[in-house]
């Protein structure tokens, strides 16, 4: 497909200056004016030469194919029809039929329920867009779709692009799909993509070569490149060696593997080496493959070749490679033990397999760190602004704000990074969380710890804990009402070392890991004393006793640090349980120093600690104190009730208008607010305050012409409010009598029968005393 005005412009070999300028501007501003890779008549691309091997990002795929997945004219039935044959996770966005917003429709698995399509409303606000029920907010719809392609959050499973869009390699193919619009869902292109098998990337096959070909290489060795990342090589030889783990397989019958004289590449040939004997071996004995690893060193005897490099010399991505010690032996020396030499090939084979699996995580971590350093990206701007804001000064609920920012940044990073990293969504979230801790919490750790220490020292928490630790050491197990004894000195020192590691760690997840290790050591010591039947009732006193002898008041800071910054999903698991146990134990120790106060039992202290923690997590109580529940009586629809948010100083007149709006009353002048109390309705004056009414009644919004005695409720209650004598009340209620009418028992019984289904229906009220003239006048007026 040619763009108008582009065919025939310039020679076939050289693009015109105008097309070059257009392509340059398009590369400068891809987000504002995307230029598609449409070929011109010469076979080139109108948008300028595209870099070979360039991967189209997920955001570009969504932007170019917006007419396919954004169907604002489609209704719910059309969405069901288009998604009925699609694989689970396929989605489209339509306009809601019942609400003024857009809806995200997603195909569900067959066994998920009666409906195979779920709809989620997309809410728009000044801060961005978000799904209904989710706390994640994004700047635009495309960013939201990108994020939910990698993380499901409230969805049943992550979103998935149609296969034709996902496998498109160039902008030209995506533009061709975009031109189809809604017809893409029923086109042959989509059907062909569905019927075809879901093939993964074609990996390069290892080809067995003859001994003559192998001898042409340096040191008669075969190089095996890691096929997981064939196109991710760096510009230098050292970078190539880092990115592609090379394994040299010996062609001799015996090859004890030991550290080489010089790290490869290249592999030097040792002087005086015995000539290769592979020419006398059949090719089938050259290399025996295993399906689990991919290579195996043949057994036998023969001269040794230059040894393999150790894992420490190869940057294979193992997280523990920098912490392990080197392989014993000097350079160029053979293995010191024949038994160790026989085991090394298998160990190195297993290590190579693990390194290949861990390499994607290192790549994701490096990519996430680069994005967080770049202010031009959404995640980078959020992270850098967060660092600047925290360093500027303390704020209320600072740790909770940091945790929310980390969750938002993780969703943005998940949307930025493509799915080609060979990581599952759950593993991707774990790697991104770890990268965020390194980029955000590591530099902020000293600042946050100093602020926590100042705050806890100012309110006396640290002082009370230090005094409680001293008393617990002096009193022993009797301070907690327990007969348990301390673990052995060796076990106590092991627990102390784990707690010291916890204090030196900046990541909350790593701190919880150290806490679990310490608690495991304590459980082992507890079972040694009490047997297998020991439980939480014995564990909490033992934990408090061990903490007292470790004498680490700084654990109070770390308990709050972990509780606020730990990922919310981890708080409900084993880590959250033992973190709560640590907080309860510290609270129990802090209470020992208070004079004339008996220490609570472990169970009571645990409940109190949980209550305090929930108070920090839940919103304040005053947020719910401005709510009033009003019942609505109507002859046609019966009785309904609603909870209304009323300002503190709102009057009854304001509440009347609010009720008329909420209950959709067509004639609000004929309705009024009444207080149902003592089997009677009392008309409320317009000037009374809504939040200062008697609490022993029910607010009812009903027709004002129903029978009632004249007057104001304030006279019966004796409050003496001046609003009862206002002009508006005199117009609404003629007379100065009682404002409430007492219903007869028969009428009350009839009313209870009409309102038996959950509401107060229309009440046919009679006079309390038939002989009273005011009641008879009211009945006559009603007739």
Curated annotation (Swiss-Prot):
Primary location group: cytoplasm
Region described as Disordered: 1-53, 250-282, 295-342, 709-783
Residue(s) carrying N-acetylmethionine: 1
List of residues that carry Phosphotyrosine: 36
Biased composition (Pro residues): 257-269
GO BP annotations, alphabetical order: endocytosis; signal transduction
Post-translational modification Phosphoserine, affected residues: 3, 16, 210, 258, 333, 337, 351, 609, 611
UniProt keyword terms in alphabetical order: Acetylation, Cytoplasm, Cytoskeleton, Endocytosis, GTPase activation, Membrane, Methylation, Phosphoprotein, SH2 domain
Molecular function terms from GO: GTPase activator activity; guanyl-nucleotide exchange factor activity; small GTPase binding
Gene3D superfamilies: SH2 domain, VPS9 domain
Keyword Zinc-finger set for record: no
Post-translational note: Phosphorylated on tyrosine residues by ABL1 and ABL2. Phosphorylation at Ser-351 by PRKD1 induces interaction with 14-3-3 proteins.
Domain Ras-associating: 624-706
CDD domains to which the protein is assigned, alphabetical: SH2_RIN1
Similarity-based family: Belongs to the RIN (Ras interaction/interference) family.
Protein name: Ras and Rab interactor 1
Protein's gene: RIN1
